[in-house]
Structure formats: C-alpha cells, structure tokens
Amino acid sequence: MIIKPKTRGFICTTTHPVGCEANVLEQINTTKAKGPITNGPKKVLVIGSSSGYGLSSRIAAAFGSGAATLGVFFEKPGTEKKPGTAGWYNSAAFDKFAKADGLYSKSINGDAFSHEAKQKAIDLIKADLGQIDMVVYSLASPVRKLPDSGELIRSSLKPIGETYTATAVDTNKDLIIETSVEPASEQEIQDTVTVMGGEDWELWLAALSDAGVLADGCKTVAYSYIGTELTWPIYWHGALGKAKMDLDRAAKALDEKLSTTGGSANVAVLKSVVTQASSAIPVMPLYIAMVFKKMREEGLHEGCMEQINRMFAERLYREDGQAPQVDDANRLRLDDWELREEIQQHCRDLWPSVTTENLSELTDYREYKDEFLKLFGFGVEGVDYDADVNPEVNFDVEQF
C-alpha cells in the first residue's frame, strides 16, 4: 500500500515501515560514528525498547558496545490493510541490522507490567544469555494493568493544587492558544504514581534477581525529566512529577541492593525531546520548539541518540573506569546543557512574545512538526513515499 501521514490529536495514526527503518539506521550510524565504548555492557535487557530513549538505549548497547540485547515492548504488527505501530517497525529494523552485524537480538511483545513478560524475559535470558549486566527501564505508558488484580490504572497529566493556565501551541491547527488544565485529585495523583512511578521497575529487578539472572556489577537505569519552572506546574510539580519522584525512591532502594554485588541503580535525567510521550504534555511542544532553536544556535542540540550515547560514554561506562558524576539525589544529569542559565533565560524572555504569526520565526516549530512526523516514519530523507510498501513486517519476536 501507499502510506501517507494522518494525524489526530497528538498522535499520527499511520506509520511508514521504510521510514521507520531509515530512522533506526540513522541512529545506528550516529552511534557507530562515535566509536566503540571500551568497557560497555555485554548483555542488556531494555524494558520499553521500541521508541524514544528506550530504542536509543538498545542501539547504544548493541552498536556502541557490541552487546546482546533483549527488548520488551507492547506494539501492534501491521496487517494487509493497516500499518502497524512505529515501535513495531523500529524494533523490526533494529533486529534486522543487529543480526546483519552478528549481534544477538530477541524481542518480547506484550504487556511489560505483567508477570508473564517478566517470566518470558527470564526464560530467554537463562536459555540464551545466562546473566545480564545492564537493565534499562524506559516505559512510557498512560495505563497500567495491575499484575495481580488485573485492575486498569490510568495516569493523569495534570497540575497539583490549582488550575494551570499557560500559553501553548495547538499542534493540529498551528495556533498559539491559552490552555488550562484542571488540578489532579488525590486519587489521580496516586494512580499516576502507580502507573509511572518506580514500583514496576522494582518488580522487574526483584524477579530478575530472584531468578539469578543478574550478573555481579549489573547496572540499572530508569529515565526521568525535571525541566525548569517553565514546565514545572504541569510536570515536576504536577502528578507526573510525583511519579518521577517515586522513581528516585525506587532507585535508592535498588542501588542499596545492587551495590552489595558491585552494581548500581540510577535515575538518568534527560533533556526534552520530541517523542510521542512529550507531545501529549500540554506546553511541552511550545517549550521544545523554543529550547531546540536556542540549543541549535549554541551548538548544544541533542536528540535521543546523542543523549544516550553521552550517558553511556561519559557517565555509566567511562573510559577511565571512574564512577559517574551524579547530583545530590544520585541522579545522572544529561539535562545539564538544556538547563544552562542563558538557554532557560532565553525561553523565559521569549515565551510571552510568541504569537501564531511569529511562531515559526521565533522558534523551531516547523522542525518540531517535522521531527514529530519522523517518529512515525514520515519526512525521512531518501524515502520514496509514493512507492508501494508492504505493511506486514515480521521479525524475531515472541508474542503473548
């Protein structure tokens, strides 16, 4: 079929398999160009490996460190009549390129919150890898099915205490609007912590540890975003922030356990990037369009892949073997460039003056839109979008 982009709200409802493959290859080439990480991980589990920072982590491990990787995700394959999700095509492309380079690559498609996913991963690790030396936790899901009761819990992207009103961009109509978000109830805050907090990360590590598949010295990392006062009401000081604070709690508990065998657990605080997850958060698209323009001008811009390559090479797996630099909460900070005072001051000054008319001139909004479509495989250089493509792409994946 010939596939064109169709957007609804903050998602694109179509995806392009060839475009997604080209995106993955671009990230692989970026990683290979950095050169190998001398003392990187060799057997890696990535939970949430099909897009964004999780996909970049899998690429960094495999193509930067020559690691065998096992990826866990929840994606839909394409059918004769309908394309699959971008994450399905990303994972298929990763698998193809990893195998072409002689690297071990297997994937599990199913609910990562379930007991079954954990057991499937353990069985594969025992059969194929023995033990793993790195676990990346990168789930971004709006809903979690509790593994014991089967109850569905939903997260909320809401402020706490009072209604949040701010200038934002309507990405469907390309208009500057004023948006208001009602505050979260106590229940909504609790539910957001249940879905997006650290509990499932702990459950994964407990299951892996009990099964004896964690090697001595195993490192685990989960991803967070803090931002600044520009986004704090909706993010760090909102319901989502409470969940990310719970990730800090989990990291501390996990670090205490893993350090007894020479391992570690850290939250890595990353910069804002264009992902399906960030596009759903009010004000983030406008903030990203502003901050990207300034960071590009300063030569500081990074996408997911550049961020994760820096985390591997300059934080977790330093050439000198030294422990990574952390903040006072033991977090790895990769948002250091974004948080530079001159970058943030620029955004603070610019925010009130952005209008629908000057949006594309004052910010990188057009680039934001391009990058958003690219997540789904569209607008990728060198791809013929008038060509007939097969939406059914299969690869080495266990489904349940």
UniProtKB/Swiss-Prot annotation:
Keyword Lipid biosynthesis appears in the UniProt entry: yes
GO molecular-function terms, A-Z: enoyl-[acyl-carrier-protein] reductase (NADH) activity; NAD binding; trans-2-enoyl-CoA reductase (NADH) activity
Keyword Lipid metabolism listed: yes
Pathway listed: Lipid metabolism; fatty acid biosynthesis
TM ranges: none
Enzyme Commission number(s): 1.3.1.9
Active site feature: 235
Alphabetized UniProt keyword annotations: Fatty acid biosynthesis, Fatty acid metabolism, Lipid biosynthesis, Lipid metabolism, NAD, Oxidoreductase
Residue(s) at site: Plays an important role in discriminating NADH against NADPH: 75
Residues binding substrate: 225
Binding, NAD(+): 48-53, 74-75, 111-112, 139-140, 244, 273-275
Domain of life of the source: Bacteria
Pfam families: Eno-Rase_FAD_bd, Eno-Rase_NADH_b, Enoyl_reductase
Catalytic activity line of the entry: a 2,3-saturated acyl-[ACP] + NAD(+) = a (2E)-enoyl-[ACP] + NADH + H(+)
GO-annotated biological processes: fatty acid biosynthetic process
NCBIfam families, A to Z: EnoyACPredFabV, PRK13656.1
Assembly: Monomer.
Job of this protein: Involved in the final reduction of the elongation cycle of fatty acid synthesis (FAS II). Catalyzes the reduction of a carbon-carbon double bond in an enoyl moiety that is covalently linked to an acyl carrier protein (ACP).
Stated family: Belongs to the TER reductase family.
HAMAP family, per the entry: FabV_reductase
This protein's name: Enoyl-[acyl-carrier-protein] reductase [NADH]
Organism, as annotated: Shewanella woodyi (strain ATCC 51908 / MS32)
